[in-house]
Amino acid sequence: MQDTPQTLNDKAKESWRALQQHAADTANDHILDYFHSDPSRVQSYSLTAAGLTLDYSKNRANSITLEKLVKLAEDAGMKRSIDAMFAGEPINHTEGRAVLHTALRDSSDTPVLVDGQDIKPEIRSALAQMERFVSKVHRGEWLGYSGKPINDVVSIGIGGSYLGPRVAVEALRPYWQENIRCHFVSNVDGSDIAYTLENLNPETTLFIVQSKSFTTQETLANSMTAREWYLREGGSEAGLSKHFVAVSSNVQRARDFGIDAENVFPMWDWVGGRYSLWSAIGLPIALQVDMKAFRELLAGAEAMDQHFKTAPLEQNMPVLMGMLGIWYHNFLGADSYVILPYDQTLENLPAHLQQVDMESNGKGVNRAGIGVDYATGPIIWGGAGTNGQHAYHQLLHQGTRWTPADFILPLKTHKPAGRHHAMLASNCFAQSQALMCGKSLEKARQELLDAGMSSERAEELAPHKVIPGNRPSNTLVMDEINPHTLGALIALYEQKVFVQGVIWNLNSFDQWGVELGKQLSDSILPMLLDTGASTDALDPSSAALVERFRRANGSGS
């Protein structure tokens, strides 16, 4: 358990100390005991919002725990912070920006002001621009240089310009347009774009260059390679504008690349990359499904936003999930969090949420620039069930470090096949039950004896089959994965991350930690390309690695 943080306000410190004492008082509690003492626990610890139902009854928390967690949220100024974000206050203070990805999915007529200007007309204009473009592509009216309609769309971006749209496209596979296939290229590793282009036809391929500044190293490198491929395979300079569009705030750089200004979709400083799938960055989503489905995605997120804004903290899904995470991370010693979607189309959701969470709250100083004396962002990881059961679930059940888990399950499938979905659901429910209930040494021994094993052998083997149990989890269910529930699900985790950032007093909307690596990469690249370039500025290890690269590529000494 961590000491009381000195960088919190006085009221929050008191609440923190109360939780520290409560953690000590309940150290030997078992989740199962909470069920035995409260027959209505499942009903009391379940909540529905925006088409999602959260069962948080399998948590190491009782009513007193939740009261104290909500008190900490109140004392940390949670309600005021929520209102400030939605009002467009510049809560990203290190960059002097508002944080208004929520405005992108706000369908009301209520103005949202940035620097005194209502941004709603710009948002509506961008959606209308997307609508016109997507409609042309889907009707076969957007023609390539040879007069053929578009069949393949390649989205080139990285980080939030890549993960969010890709996750949404994959999750909404039942809603795909038949004649469009979306591909995603992000890595500067040349094999990424090379393998993507291998089976594409330049006559029928559209590229979307996704970069706010139009200077992102990886995105520009891949876009230039795509441009060269297009020209090499028969495309013309004159037809370039039919095959390349951009999502960027730097219209001039996009024009210099060869993209018509009217085919540059806007980005704004008040939308962070990891929160940008709701903007024109979501153009690949709209092209792969349609604008109606894209608007439903926005509507689902808006429904979760409305719940987050208006529900009391003790009945607020993002707040409860966020505060339970605080409980485990700061008071019970968990240092990671696993997200387990039991749906193959959500296979990459944990990767997107990993970025949203770890880039937002992986910070070591508070909003005043003072080093924090408490743990902040946890390690986020996970993958699709049931695959994980044959990999890392062993650690979840018997490892020496326990990890809180979120199970995510659509109750119905778009692709029924025999008993498959019932089998999937049974595994999902069984895993959360096993984490909570475990298996005692006595039960393990008796099972072995009942199976006909000798007493001596059963005594030897039983300890290896013990499952400690008392390991917490949430279960999130929805009727099905559709645009609305997907939007709500992603927004839920966005707001959960915000909640935790408020408690830790962080700026969850900058990412200065990624800049140093970019700077060093810019200085190392010339050393790899020019064998005469000095490596004296590098540390000995890095200099040796540069020399090894040179030799491997026939240019070293």
UniProtKB/Swiss-Prot annotation:
Subcellular location: Cytoplasm
Listed GO biological process terms: gluconeogenesis; glucose 6-phosphate metabolic process; glycolytic process
GO MF term set: carbohydrate derivative binding; glucose-6-phosphate isomerase activity; monosaccharide binding
Lineage top rank: taxon: Bacteria
PROSITE patterns assigned: P_GLUCOSE_ISOMERASE_1, P_GLUCOSE_ISOMERASE_2, P_GLUCOSE_ISOMERASE_3
The reaction(s) this protein catalyses: alpha-D-glucose 6-phosphate = beta-D-fructose 6-phosphate
Pathway: Carbohydrate biosynthesis; gluconeogenesis; Carbohydrate degradation; glycolysis; D-glyceraldehyde 3-phosphate and glycerone phosphate from D-glucose: step 2/4
Pfam families linked: PGI (PF00342)
Entry EC number(s): 5.3.1.9
Gene Ontology CC terms, in alphabetical order: cytosol
Key words of the record: Cytoplasm, Gluconeogenesis, Glycolysis, Isomerase
Active site: 359, 390, 518
Family listed: Belongs to the GPI family.
UniProt function note: Catalyzes the reversible isomerization of glucose-6-phosphate to fructose-6-phosphate.
PANTHER family: GLUCOSE-6-PHOSPHATE ISOMERASE
Entries under NCBIfam families matching the protein: PRK00179.1
Protein's name according to its UniProt entry: Glucose-6-phosphate isomerase
